[in-house]
């Protein structure tokens, strides 16, 4: 994404403050208890990250490409953790952002801190943006995707990537859906969770009237005796469509199915009853584009 540029050093080979980007505060990691490093500690502890990141108003962006997309979306960095050889690239990427601390260390030090091999070179602790009202997110939208209680972060990230790549306008997620800004979701989405407009929905008792009032036809993707096939539905797609996807284990709730104007299914063969929800989202979005 950016031409590789080595870190600035003094005559003795020590990393020094870069004069071209004076607002970047470079801190060489010589102690894992340095203030600010808690944001990156034990990244492999899934339960801890789920509890700590949202509560702290932060999310973790991994790789220079994802960090660049976060910055382009206007998300403010709190700090960056980077391997020495990628410091030059990160300094140029952060140009114009005031008072950003960049923690620098070798691969072994960063792995000791985070709990895994930082093969993508950089992490950033980003301040979470405030969630927008549903009405703002769906204003002007023609195709939206609704995720109900999908708790697998990989699936959430893959669905966002499909939404961005195939061209839906927004994503709405249920109160119990996995966090799109969890590190794995962001990574799997290739940073598209930072581009696609999204927010959380209230419960269906409020969400369905809200979507209907905005003119959306609610189509639930599910296995049902009353379902129409995807091809049948695609023959006459409503002008404003909300496509609802559920978890692979339990599927959609009774409330979601009751709220739907149409239940749609993807016909399968060879004894397979359904696709992975992320794959199903891509098939449905492409067919209904």
Regions found by a protein language model. Give the residues of each.
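Active-site/ligand-binding-proximal alpha/beta "capping" segment
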Residues: 219-272
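RNA substrate-binding interface of SAM-dependent RNA methyltransferases
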Residues: 27, 72, 129-226
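Short, aromatic/basic amphipathic alpha-helical patches
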Residues: 88-99, 256
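Boundary-proximal intrinsically disordered activation/regulatory segments immediately upstream
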Residues: 17-85
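N-terminal amphipathic/basic-hydrophobic helices that include classical n-h-c signal peptides
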Residues: 1-23
């Amino acid at each position: 994404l950016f031409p590789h540029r080595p870190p600035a050093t003094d005559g003795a080979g020590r990393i020094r403050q870069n004069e071209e980007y004076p607002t970047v505060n470079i801190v060489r990691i010589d102690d894992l208890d340095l203030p600010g490093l808690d944001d990156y500690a034990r990244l492999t502890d899934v339960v801890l990250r789920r509890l700590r990141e949202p509560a702290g108003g932060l999310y973790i962006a991994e790789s220079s490409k994802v960090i660049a997309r976060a910055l382009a979306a206007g998300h403010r960095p709190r700090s960056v953790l980077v391997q020495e050889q990628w410091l030059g690239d990160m300094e140029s990427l952060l140009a114009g952002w005031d008072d950003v601390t960049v923690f620098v260390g070798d691969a072994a030090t960063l792995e000791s801190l985070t709990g895994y091999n930082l093969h993508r070179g950089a992490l950033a602790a980003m301040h979470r943006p405030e969630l927008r009202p549903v009405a703002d997110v769906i204003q002007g939208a023609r195709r939206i995707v609704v995720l109900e209680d999908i708790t697998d972060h990989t699936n959430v990230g893959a669905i966002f990537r499909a939404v961005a790549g195939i061209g839906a306008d927004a994503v709405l997620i249920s109160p119990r859906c996995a966090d799109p800004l969890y590190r794995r979701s962001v990574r799997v989405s290739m940073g598209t969770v930072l581009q696609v407009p999204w927010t959380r929905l209230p419960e269906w008792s409020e969400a369905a009237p809200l979507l209907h009032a905005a003119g959306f036809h609610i189509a639930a993707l599910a296995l049902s005796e009353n379902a129409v096939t995807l091809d049948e539905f695609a023959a006459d797609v409503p002008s404003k469509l909300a496509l609802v996807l559920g978890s692979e284990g339990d599927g959609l709730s009774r409330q979601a199915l009751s709220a739907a104007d149409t239940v749609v299914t993807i016909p399968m063969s060879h004894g397979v009853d359904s696709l992975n929800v992320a794959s199903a989202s891509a098939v449905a979005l492409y067919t209904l584009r």
